[in-house]
Amino acid sequence: MSNIEERVKKIVVEQLGVKEEEVTNSASFVEDLGADSLDTVELVMALEEEFETEIPDEEAEKITTVQQAIDYINAHAQG
């Protein structure tokens, strides 16, 4: 597991209050992890802060699974 993947999963666990083993790469934030729209906004903000990047709203709307978040961060983050 990459450092980015670990960090993304840790943020998901903290933000959504779910168990680590529930946070699989294919897990959907809404369907599998029970997030609502406010949770997803807070999750995006936490990812932006952790990885020092800006995630535009139109991009954030496309990030619906753990893997999509990992892929976005891999493509756009500085650290």
From Swiss-Prot:
GO biological process: lipid A biosynthetic process
Record-annotated Carrier domain positions: 2-77
Role played: Carrier of the growing fatty acid chain in fatty acid biosynthesis.
GO cellular component, one term: cytosol
NCBIfam families: acyl_carrier (TIGR00517), PRK00982.1-2 (NF002148), PRK00982.1-3 (NF002149), PRK00982.1-4 (NF002150), PRK00982.1-5 (NF002151)
Gene3D superfamilies the record matches: ACP-like (1.10.1200.10)
Family classification: Belongs to the acyl carrier protein (ACP) family.
Sites bearing O-(pantetheine 4'-phosphoryl)serine, chain numbering: 37
Protein name, per record: Acyl carrier protein
Subcellular location(s) per record: Cytoplasm
Gene: acpP
Pathway it works in: Lipid metabolism; fatty acid biosynthesis
Keyword terms: Cytoplasm, Fatty acid biosynthesis, Fatty acid metabolism, Lipid biosynthesis, Lipid metabolism, Phosphopantetheine, Phosphoprotein
Signal peptide (from-to): none
Domain of life assignment: Bacteria
Molecular-function annotations in GO: acyl binding; acyl carrier activity
Pfam family, one: PP-binding
PTM characteristics: 4'-phosphopantetheine is transferred from CoA to a specific serine of apo-ACP by AcpS. This modification is essential for activity because fatty acids are bound in thioester linkage to the sulfhydryl of the prosthetic group.
Organism: Thioalkalivibrio sulfidiphilus (strain HL-EbGR7)
The keyword Lipid metabolism is annotated on this UniProt entry: yes
